[in-house]
Amino acid sequence: MGDDRPFVCNAPGCGQRFTNEDHLAVHKHKHEMTLKFGPARTDSVIIADQTPTPTRFLKNCEEVGLFNELASSFEHEFKKAADEDEKKAAAGPLDMSLPSTPDIKIKEEEPVEVDSSPPDSPASSPCSPPLKEKEVTPKPVLISTPTPTIVRPGSLPLHLGYDPLHPTLPSPTSVITQAPPSNRQMGSPTGSLPLVMHLANGQTMPVLPGPPVQMPSVISLARPVSMVPNIPGIPGPPVNSSGSISPSGHPIPSEAKMRLKATLTHQVSSINGGCGMVVGSASTMVTARPEQSQILIQHPDAPSPAQPQVSPAQPTPSTGGRRRRTVDEDPDERRQRFLERNRAAASRCRQKRKLWVSSLEKKAEELTSQNIQLSNEVTLLRNEVAQLKQLLLAHKDCPVTALQKKTQGYLESPKESSEPTGSPAPVIQHSSATAPSNGLSVRSAAEAVATSVLTQMASQRTELSMPIQSHVIMTPQSQSAGR
């Protein structure tokens, strides 16, 4: 059995044998793949199965082992690039300029330099005059001090007063900030230098120098700032190849994680562009404006290394900073707009309600006046009916039979074609003649006669006004003759 399969797998817990070396190599490769990708597959969030967003990547980078992989993959390339850039820096001064920016005037009273030194050097030191490079005892840098200060990448992360964003510079050189009143400038060499981070356990972790990275926490301006392409009298900064991290108040693993997060975040945000300052990857020189930047505060944990801190009053120019500030201010602005819309809607509703109520009041007044007019007309008509009834009651016993017979023929002749009913005269005669014989009450008969006469008189007014007038005139004459 052992002679047929002489090749044995030396992995712990596996004693399989194979006939040839190729099968053993394939088997060992399976072991390596399992050991390498096993923890990632058992993780709660599987990056391969989901959309690889920056948030998920930054959340799970430590569990996946991203730091070790980056250090082992790019260490040689970054060391080689650092050596080449060191040779270039030693050959001649760097051209601290950006190609696409206009010029502004600057004060040249205190020129500053970019200095990079080994990790045991202090993180911040006052700058010497140009063409002289010497180490000075580190002093705490306060806001009111007029001396410029060199801050190495080791003293990053940046601590904001109110914003927990920690961006980093993707270069081994330093950011020079200065507090006295002067113009602000920023320069960048055309070449880029990588940054290799040496961790405490002996490993090195490179930071990828991607496209120009926006620095919202180090360089912040409230108005547009221009760049100076070439500064006479200031030599290029001598760059040390180590680019290592100087001691700071925070533990080194947290700095490494934070640097990686900030680099990835700025590489994503720099694609969208913005109106912020673009920082080159080799060196950046900044001189502050009097009303806008006092940005160096000594870190409370470390006595000598000074870490830049942005005052809360300065606006952050990059897209990420604006987005974060907008998110912070959004609730108040949304509430303000919501209240304004509510007030406008309430005022419009009140106006509509006032118009509706006023129209209802006008309509009610019109209907009330019309009702009063109609009631007055009804009262007048009732009074007229009462008067006519009294006249009929007064003349109910008049001997008008002969006169009615005479006028009957005259009244019926023009009404034969239009009105077949009889004239009121025979009705009066019939009622007056039949009232005593039937034994009815005189008043009830008079009311019935008056009602019928009024209805017929109303119908005859339009057609036979003259005969009715003669009849009305003749009735009192016959009454007076009878009396």
Swiss-Prot record:
It is found in: Nucleus; Nucleus, Nucleoplasm; Chromosome, Telomere. A zinc finger (C2H2-type) spans 7-31. Residues 114-126, 307-320 have a biased composition (Low complexity). GO terms for molecular function: DNA binding; DNA-binding transcription factor activity; zinc ion binding. Residues 360-388 are annotated as: Leucine-zipper. Residues 332-395 form the bZIP domain. Stress-responsive chromatin regulator that plays a role in various biological processes including innate immunological memory, adipocyte differentiation or telomerase regulation. In absence of stress, contributes to the formation of heterochromatin and heterochromatin-like structure by recruiting histone H3K9 tri- and di-methyltransferases thus silencing the transcription of target genes such as STAT1 in adipocytes, or genes involved in innate immunity in macrophages and adipocytes. Homodimer; binds DNA as homodimer. Heterodimer; heterodimerizes with other members of ATF family and with JUN family members. Interacts with JNK2; the interaction does not phosphorylate ATF7 but acts as a docking site for other ATF-associated partners such as JUN family members. Interacts (via its transactivation domain) with TAF12 (isoforms TAFII15 and TAFII20); the interaction potentiates the transactivation activity (isoform TAFII20 only) and is inhibited by ATF7 sumoylation. Interacts with TAF4; the interaction inhibits the TAF12-dependent transactivation. This is Cyclic AMP-dependent transcription factor ATF-7. It comes from Pongo abelii. The lineage of its organism: Eukaryota, Metazoa, Chordata, Craniata, Vertebrata.
